[in-house]
Amino acid sequence: MAVTKLVLVRHGESQWNKENRFTGWYDVDLSEKGVSEAKAAGKLLKEEGFSFDFAYTSVLKRAIHTLWNVLDELDQAWLPVEKSWKLNERHYGALQGLNKAETAEKYGDEQVKQWRRGFAVTPPELTKDDERYPGHDPRYAKLSEKELPLTESLALTIDRVIPYWNDTILPRMKSGERVIIAAHGNSLRALVKYLDNMSEDEILELNIPTGVPLVYEFDENFKPIKHYYLGNADEIAAKAAAVANQGKAK
């Protein structure tokens, strides 16, 4: 049976991950630790014999720079890359820039958990005159006003990620190309929910660690057979738990 592999990598720790702030579409860069995580992911992929024909990432530099570091370790810096806003992190609306623990102290752990992980729950909206509104950013100049979010739930994130998967990424895989995607916690959760047919309750509890390669294997009909992280299982579990705890009051 022919098996096709897909590699997903959430960006390494960003400066705002480190500061425990809601990031969303804000274009913050990797922390030193995040760069190290990205390089380690690349080394791990090389050790496991992976190489690629094409890469996808978002238009946010924490994902782009993660991909650069991964490809550098693989000696595949030449690889063609498509960047799309459809792989961006979920837009966190008016929460962007706020400290997660302080927000939990103000609104309660459960409210923040729902804002972070609830399937159809949207954080408070931005206004269009807010400097954080993506309509002010030249990288989104070609998007219609309807496409520019004021806030997003995971459900709304799925609405942009899955058509991009089906229309753009999957056909390339079906043509025989080996693909890697470097993206974000929630754009990857959107894809994982779809691939694994997870319920809304199941996705609520899913936390994807930074900078750890997640491998999906597909059968000849491009149905997922299995998935697994590369690396030390205990370390990966600890990183996922740390992601879950970011939204709790101290």
Curated annotation (Swiss-Prot):
PROSITE patterns: PG_MUTASE (PS00175). GO terms for molecular function: phosphoglycerate mutase activity. The active site is at H11 (tele-phosphohistidine intermediate), E89 (proton donor/acceptor). It catalyses: (2R)-2-phosphoglycerate = (2R)-3-phosphoglycerate. Homodimer. This is 2,3-bisphosphoglycerate-dependent phosphoglycerate mutase. SMART domains: PGAM. Catalyzes the interconversion of 2-phosphoglycerate and 3-phosphoglycerate. It comes from Salmonella typhi. Gene3D superfamilies: Phosphoglycerate mutase-like. Disulfide bonds: none annotated. Its EC number is 5.4.2.11. NCBIfam families: pgm_1, PRK14115.1. Belongs to the phosphoglycerate mutase family. BPG-dependent PGAM subfamily. Substrate binds at residues 10-17, 23-24, 62, 89-92, 100, 116-117, 185-186. Keywords: Gluconeogenesis, Glycolysis, Isomerase. The record marks H184 as: Transition state stabilizer. Coiled coil: none annotated. CDD domains: HP_PGM_like. GO terms for biological process: gluconeogenesis; glycolytic process. The lineage of its organism: Bacteria, Pseudomonadati, Pseudomonadota, Gammaproteobacteria, Enterobacterales. It is an enzyme of class 5 (isomerase). Pathway: Carbohydrate degradation; glycolysis; pyruvate from D-glyceraldehyde 3-phosphate: step 3/5.
